[in-house]
């Protein structure tokens, strides 16, 4: 049976940094308050760039590292909740054009909020395993600054902009002697719409009561409730995927969770007995970048020499919907 591999990773964040001290001048908050509750020190903000612009820059880097030419990419999928256009064209179509990919390439977007990259992995690897595609470019890209209410101190301190991309490819003739399990070993995704209103961006079409018109189009979150559900759900999901694949926590080279909040990351890490050396944490530098957070973290681990060919990595994410998921991957090959 064919398998899929993650050949490469790439990321891009816009150059402008907005620090906690900058936010002190904008809303009633403080660096101490933000760091204590979130672990975030700064975030990057896209001033004159769209999600598609950032996606193309992250994808260019991932493709350059993959050993695959642009002509060999036969599908591009973007995960985003902040697309360049309201409903069409898709950000994937826009990004394919920016990259100069083949005309007629399969291109579409998905929306799974902070779990978007896990969903991309599942869809992309399924296309490859089925034989429908050979090389799939997946991109999580977000301009969350465009949906943040900059007067709401509870949410505006949390989010940043950026993009992360990966090239997935058929494992044919790419095993290079690495013993199984290899490639994309297992992925689990799930959802529960019962608590959708705890984390949402309502519009006039949403029919949500008690939200004034001037607050439509902004991200709304009940943070304490989301925190409790996220920690429990993520912990359970990781336990299941490890048990299913007979992998012990100490066998994981890198645990790369969605970078939402340092307290959530620490809570899940401690519940599962991962060490600091295993855990990749970038939330302090970039804030919550939703679907881009996991590939941005993977890219940083790669550039720092922590993510290597053959590394066994565990990813997990939880986001609006609710959506969540986990993935077990042997990187590279």
From Swiss-Prot:
EC assignment: 2.3.1.180
InterPro entries given in the database record: ACP_syn_III_C, ACP_syn_III_N, FabH, Thiolase-like
Annotated Gene Ontology cellular component terms: cytoplasm
Region (ACP-binding): 259-263
Associated pathway: Lipid metabolism; fatty acid biosynthesis
Compartments where found: Cytoplasm
Molecular functions (GO terms): 3-oxoacyl-[acyl-carrier-protein] synthase activity; beta-ketoacyl-acyl-carrier-protein synthase III activity
GO biological process: one example: fatty acid biosynthetic process
Record has Lipid biosynthesis as a keyword: yes
Alphabetical keyword list: Acyltransferase, Cytoplasm, Fatty acid biosynthesis, Fatty acid metabolism, Lipid biosynthesis, Lipid metabolism, Multifunctional enzyme, Transferase
Active site: residue positions: 114, 258, 288
Entry similarity comment: Belongs to the thiolase-like superfamily. FabH family.
Protein purpose: Catalyzes the condensation reaction of fatty acid synthesis by the addition to an acyl acceptor of two carbons from malonyl-ACP. Catalyzes the first condensation reaction which initiates fatty acid synthesis and may therefore play a role in governing the total rate of fatty acid production. Possesses both acetoacetyl-ACP synthase and acetyl transacylase activities. Its substrate specificity determines the biosynthesis of branched-chain and/or straight-chain of fatty acids.
Protein name per its UniProtKB record: Beta-ketoacyl-[acyl-carrier-protein] synthase III
Lineage: Bacteria, Pseudomonadati, Campylobacterota, Epsilonproteobacteria, Campylobacterales
């Amino acid at each position: 049976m064919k398998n899929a591999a993650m050949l490469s990773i790439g990321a891009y964040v816009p150059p402008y940094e907005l620090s906690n001290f900058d936010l002190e001048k904008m809303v009633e908050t403080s660096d101490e308050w933000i760091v204590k509750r979130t672990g975030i020190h700064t975030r990057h903000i896209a001033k004159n760039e769209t999600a598609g612009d950032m996606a193309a820059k992250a994808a260019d880097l991932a493709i350059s590292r993959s050993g695959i030419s642009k002509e060999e990419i036969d599908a591009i999928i973007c995960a985003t909740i902040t697309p360049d256009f309201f409903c069409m064209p898709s950000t994937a179509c826009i990004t394919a054009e920016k990259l100069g990919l083949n005309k007629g390439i399969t291109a579409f977007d998905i929306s799974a909020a902070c779990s978007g990259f896990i969903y991309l992995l599942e869809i992309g690897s399924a296309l490859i395993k089925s034989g429908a595609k050979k090389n799939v470019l997946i991109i999580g890209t977000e301009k969350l600054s465009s949906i943040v209410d900059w007067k709401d101190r509870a949410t505006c301190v949390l989010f940043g902009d950026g993009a992360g991309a990966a090239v997935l490819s058929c494992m044919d003739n790419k095993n290079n002697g690495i013993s199984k399990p290899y490639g994309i070993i297992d992925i689990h995704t799930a959802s529960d719409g019962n608590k959708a209103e705890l984390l949402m961006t309502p519009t006039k079409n949403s029919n949500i009561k008690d939200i004034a018109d001037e607050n439509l189009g902004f991200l709304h979150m009940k943070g304490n409730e989301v925190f409790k559900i996220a920690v429990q759900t993520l912990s359970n999901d990781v336990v299941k995927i490890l048990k299913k694949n007979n992998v012990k926590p100490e066998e994981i080279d890198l645990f790369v969770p969605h970078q939402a909040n340092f307290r959530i990351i620490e809570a899940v890490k401690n519940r599962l007995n991962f060490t600091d050396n295993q855990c990749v944490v970038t939330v302090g530098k970039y804030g919550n970048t939703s679907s881009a957070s996991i590939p941005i973290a993977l890219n940083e681990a790669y550039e720092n020499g922590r993510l290597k060919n053959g590394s066994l990595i565990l990813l997990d994410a939880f986001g609006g919907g609710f959506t969540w998921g986990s993935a077990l991957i042997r990187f590279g090959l």
